[in-house]
From Swiss-Prot:
Family: Belongs to the NAD-dependent DNA ligase family. LigA subfamily.
Keyword Manganese: yes
Protein name: DNA ligase
Physiological role: DNA ligase that catalyzes the formation of phosphodiester linkages between 5'-phosphoryl and 3'-hydroxyl groups in double-stranded DNA using NAD as a coenzyme and as the energy source for the reaction. It is essential for DNA replication and repair of damaged DNA.
Keywords: DNA damage, DNA repair, DNA replication, Ligase, Magnesium, Manganese, Metal-binding, NAD, Zinc
Gene name per UniProt: ligA
Annotated residues for binding of NAD(+): 32-36, 81-82, 110, 133, 167, 283, 307
Residues binding Zn(2+): 401, 404, 419, 424
Amino acid sequence: MGNIKSRVNELHDLLNQYGYEYYVQDNPSVPDSEYDKLLRELIDIEEAHPEFKSPDSPTVRVGGEVQSSFEKVNHDTPMLSLGNAFNEQELRRFDQRIREQVGSVEYMCELKIDGLAVSLKYVEGRFVQGLTRGDGTTGEDITENLRTIHAIPLKINEPLSFEVRGEAYMPRSSFIRLNEEKEKNEEQPFANPRNAAAGSLRQLDPKLAAKRKLSVFLYSVNDFTDFDATTQSGALDELDRLGFKTNHERMRVGDIEGVLEYIEKWTKQREQLSYDIDGIVIKVNDIEQQDEMGYTQKSPRWAIAYKFPAEEVVTTLQDIELSIGRTGVVTPTAILDPVRVAGTTVSRASLHNEDLIHERDIRIGDSVVVKKAGDIIPEVVKSITERRPEGTLPYSMPTHCPSCDHELVRIEGEVALRCINPKCQAQLVEGLIHFVSRQAMNIDGLGTKIIQQLYHHNVINDVADIFYLTEDDLLPLERMGSKKVENLLKAIEDAKANSLEHLLFGLGIRHLGVKASQVLAEKYETMDRLLEVTEEELISIHDIGDKLAQSVVTYLENEDIKALIEKLKYKNVNMVYNGIKTSDIEGHPDFKNKTIVLTGKLQQLTRKEASAWLELQGAKVTSSVTKKTDLVIAGEDAGSKLTKAEKFGTEIWTEEQFVAKQNEISS
């Protein structure tokens, strides 16, 4: 036994050293095959002698047991956000304020990694807990997923107790591999590496997180008690010494001019990195000066984040492709010469509608400027007319549907062209794809390509047909083995139990979104009651307007739709609301039964987190301000919704007021 224990310790040391060289120093001393061989040996020993497996064994990198949920945990000290600067003038104002308060100052400039903020707690040198930022006060415990990231040391060589914070991210190479795998499996690819990293760390199965090949850069120490560092740069050097991965592109500068030079450099060179950045973080380097300056309620006064402007690139517009949505809207898409924009290769970009094409005089063959709105959605900004080839013609939208050849119409008050043929194949297929989507019936494994095959082989013609599928229908399809078919049929069976709001949203009734589906399902409880509802009844409901009421009643009165519902009932698809009713939520009197709108950029929590918390308090969170809105919570750069709220005399809170009320209720 002594020899086995000794070998286990030796394997720990070797694997930790080789992992540090590969994942932190990026300078491996042994080939991957040697690392894999040693890891396999350790796994075999631990399986034969589980008494020798420790919580910080290198084998935890492959992932442990599936978790049922992520526990909410309070941060020892809040994980605050940073104030933003978008131009040189705002940076100079920040510098002036700093110097007025503390005098002479040195700055530490660091790359702002585009990932997910995490907090890692070490006790006596061992990694014991990892949290997401959450709302800044409370995060989710994702310890088991973070253990799979090789760049996070499970144990350090000194028995120190402290908290270190950083950014978990997905390298571009991992992102490309992951999306290739998703496309191969007919799954929706991630929009960008940031979303991929966040989604990976929220997997309940750590083994899935382990496969995603995430990394991390650590950038701050929360408690300096066990550290000799007196500066931010010194703290990062100390983290380096202890074996943590920090970003070595950081730079100390003596004044704001040095900051601006650093920003200029990385604005030009960001694409040369192997990971995404979305800005530069500027911090006062001296920790005593940081303490002197202190914090606002939401951010440190001694730091600011400079956000890069949306990157614009020039490429050639090769064609304009038209797609038909499930409601018949014809959407033009630019087909481009592939070009890298904000970290990903773009070959398609939105053109929105016919009016935009004409306003910007965009023509096939033009050199066009492309950017990503919010660094996510590619769009064509303009044509460069001085580069326009001779003989190009203004683009004309077709008069007939490219799918069914039905005449296209423009409904009064709308900018979109629309196909109104209810038998249009493109619309029917898009409707099927919508029906199985995550927010609708959430049928995992029934992707776009499978639906297209089933439709074009006349196996399914409407959404009810999905519940009549058999093994014989699915096995002949491309890439459909018996195991995949078994899993898909189970997912279809499970979907039958979905609450009524999922079915309502999945049916694709025009103007009926997720929130309104929830409202109707909760109000009427069964599909049978909904089938009898009148427009007047619907309009009297707080969140239902005239257009939606008319659309719902017209849809449900259609005899074909009534037959479709009967067809779904025959296969025991649930037609009853089985969620929690708002009236049953205890909630808080400041929010219960109130209609609330969130607008602007929230700094201390995400829009999704704020909405979820408000709904737990019994509120209804909607997307538009009306005379029926009770409260508007306005973040930074709030626009027309705030103006509308002021016009209606609606109560308005700042984000700070909202967070203060959250803290009051939670305490």
